């Protein structure tokens, strides 16, 4: 076990790096480029007292500069050896768990009362104990970008809009270098808890981010684009080349900013997911061969242009169609 950090964070990180060998089964590629690290921290713009959760802290390349600005940080780490070493840091709460099993709503509720000093697993069946009061902060949200634009098209308008989000102090800011092999499941897991999240900043495979932020009528636009853009404003904020990691991955990476829309359309998310999956099941064919038949089978009486391909339909139209189909059952 490492000695407590105290006033020697650089030595603590050096010992952590020496003691750990990357594991392929966890998809571990550790960020080492200091310029990229500084760029990510600048994009996140953490403020003291904010409830920030880092997924996959690894060798603490991003963790240490974050905690220096925050005062306290909660991290989620699956690797048992890394979790053990990270616990040596007095300003970290370590949740040793698969992130897909973490209950983010419960975690947000508990962090509202201050840093969770226990490393208990915040799941529905097992809650962390030993909560302590947190220091308060009067600082406002730091993201000028959020105040200027909501980025990706909001479902209700179909084009870029100006939007300001009213954020409760208890909401989470979630960051991390996500394992590329399970990045999409993690994104959808967080979508289930989006109402308790202020924003998200993730390192991902660049081609995944290209799909996330893609506009209609482009080759990258697909199911992932629709399912995330209806709920988030998103922006690709930083390109990250393979040589920024150890070991270097075989793909380019990037950092995406995801800010939940302040006033999302009310809809049945499962129905939207099913509808979009049918639409993109044969993306090169006209929708009359896929979604059109799906709508006919449900006796849909409304008007929807199926003489298009799935990639030509804006997010707003998919959302409106899901609402109309749901209304039929009322």
Swiss-Prot record:
Cell location: Cytoplasm
Location of the region described as Disordered in the Swiss-Prot/TrEMBL record: 115-158
GO molecular function: 16S rRNA (adenine(1518)-N(6)/adenine(1519)-N(6))-dimethyltransferase activity; RNA binding
UniProt keyword list: Cytoplasm, Methyltransferase, RNA-binding, rRNA processing, S-adenosyl-L-methionine, Transferase
Pfam families: RrnaAD
This enzyme's EC code(s): 2.1.1.182
Top-level taxon: Bacteria
Cellular component terms (Gene Ontology): cytosol
Main enzyme class: transferase
Reaction(s) catalysed (UniProt annotation): adenosine(1518)/adenosine(1519) in 16S rRNA + 4 S-adenosyl-L-methionine = N(6)-dimethyladenosine(1518)/N(6)-dimethyladenosine(1519) in 16S rRNA + 4 S-adenosyl-L-homocysteine + 4 H(+)
Keyword match Transcription: no
Residues where S-adenosyl-L-methionine binds: 29, 31, 56, 77, 98, 177
SUPFAM superfamilies linked: S-adenosyl-L-methionine-dependent methyltransferases
Function: Specifically dimethylates two adjacent adenosines (A1518 and A1519) in the loop of a conserved hairpin near the 3'-end of 16S rRNA in the 30S particle. May play a critical role in biogenesis of 30S subunits.
PANTHER family: DIMETHYLADENOSINE TRANSFERASE, DIMETHYLADENOSINE TRANSFERASE-RELATED
Family of the protein in this entry: Belongs to the class I-like SAM-binding methyltransferase superfamily. rRNA adenine N(6)-methyltransferase family. RsmA subfamily.
Protein's name in the database: Ribosomal RNA small subunit methyltransferase A
Organism: Polaromonas sp. (strain JS666 / ATCC BAA-500)
């Amino acid at each position: 076990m490492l000695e407590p950090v105290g006033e020697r964070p650089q030595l603590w990180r050096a010992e952590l790096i020496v003691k750990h060998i990357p594991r392929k089964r966890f998809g571990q590629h550790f960020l080492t480029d200091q310029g990229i690290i500084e760029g990510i921290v600048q994009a996140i713009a953490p403020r003291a007292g904010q409830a920030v959760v880092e997924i996959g802290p690894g060798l603490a390349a991003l963790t240490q500069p974050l905690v220096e600005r925050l005062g306290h940080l909660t991290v989620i780490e699956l690797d048992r050896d890394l979790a053990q070493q990270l616990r040596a840091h007095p300003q970290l709460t370590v949740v040793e768990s698969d992130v897909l099993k973490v209950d983010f709503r419960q975690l947000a509720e508990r962090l509202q009362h201050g840093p969770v000093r226990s490393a208990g697993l915040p799941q529905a069946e097992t809650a962390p104990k030993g909560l302590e009061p947190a220091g308060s902060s009067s600082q406002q949200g730091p993201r000028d970008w959020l105040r200027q634009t909501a980025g990706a098209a909001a479902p209700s308008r179909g084009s870029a809009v100006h939007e300001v989000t009213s954020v409760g102090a208890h909401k989470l800011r979630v960051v991390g270098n996500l394992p590329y092999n399970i990045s999409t499941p993690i994104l959808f897991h967080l979508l289930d808890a989006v109402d308790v999240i202020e924003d998200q900043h993730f390192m991902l495979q660049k081609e995944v981010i290209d799909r996330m932020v893609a506009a209609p009528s482009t080759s990258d636009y697909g199911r992932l684009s629709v399912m995330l853009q209806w709920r988030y404003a998103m922006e690709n904020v930083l390109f990250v080349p393979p040589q920024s990691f150890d070991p270097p991955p075989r793909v380019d990476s990037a950092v995406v900013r995801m800010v939940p829309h302040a006033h999302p359309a009310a809809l049945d998310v499962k129905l939207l997911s099913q509808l979009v999956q049918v639409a993109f099941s044969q993306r090169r064919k006209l929708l009359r061969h896929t979604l059109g038949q799906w709508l006919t089978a449900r006796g849909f009486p409304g008007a929807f242009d199926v003489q298009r391909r799935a990639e030509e339909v804006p997010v707003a139209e998919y959302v409106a169609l899901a609402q109309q189909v749901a209304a039929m059952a009322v």
